[in-house]
Amino acid sequence: MYKRQAVASSGSLNLYEIGRVSYPGFEAPLWRVLFRPQPGVKYKILFSAGLHGNEPAGAECALRFIEAIARSPEKYKDVAFDIIPLGNPWGWTHDIRFNQAGIDINRDFATFDSQEAKIIRSTLGKGPFSMMFDLHEDPDATGFYIYQYGIEDRHLTRQIVAAIADLGYPVEQDIKMVVLKTENGIIDAPMWGLQYMRLTGQLSITNYYRLYHSPYVFTVETPTALPFDDRLSMQRTAVDMLVDYYTK
């Protein structure tokens, strides 16, 4: 209902059911929200949220952003948006990271074993997109951080991290993986790392779109240890800055 109300208030927004997720005792649609303000727009942006069902701030941020488009469509007159506000409806309903089959949807964009990843690829897999980003949360983090994929320039991500810090929110310093680590809230993921993840069959949605469909791709992460409204504020700050930077 929330999505329908926002979409109904703007003639340029459209809500589509792109497929149905079906499990024993559970069925739900996957929604795609499109904003097409005029023919011949300069930019096309894709963003997704809710691929992990226990990370609610991203899905809420996507809905709030859809509302913002409906209120001020003229602000985005040169931008076409494709938005997947909730990629894992079963996980969201049950507050669980995975889908009912136990698949991490955000590691399934190499093998496409899950219903959800298959539906998203079949609908949005062609691209290209000027920019793509995905909204997530981290139960182990203590602060905000952001991934950028195969992008040498840190100017934008530094600005986003600084804006988050200026709002009084913590910035993550200690996320360490096998080959990646956080440096003042930023994780640089090189292209060779994405190719490696493809070979291991563990591509995230952002890995997939960076490899095949967009030159500018980001993942926003907020710590679930903080209050929900704070996480939502951090997500929205990052989303607004990403969109503004690539639509100037």
What would you call each of these model-derived segments?
Residues K3-K248:
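Structured catalytic-domain cores with a bias toward divalent-metal coordination
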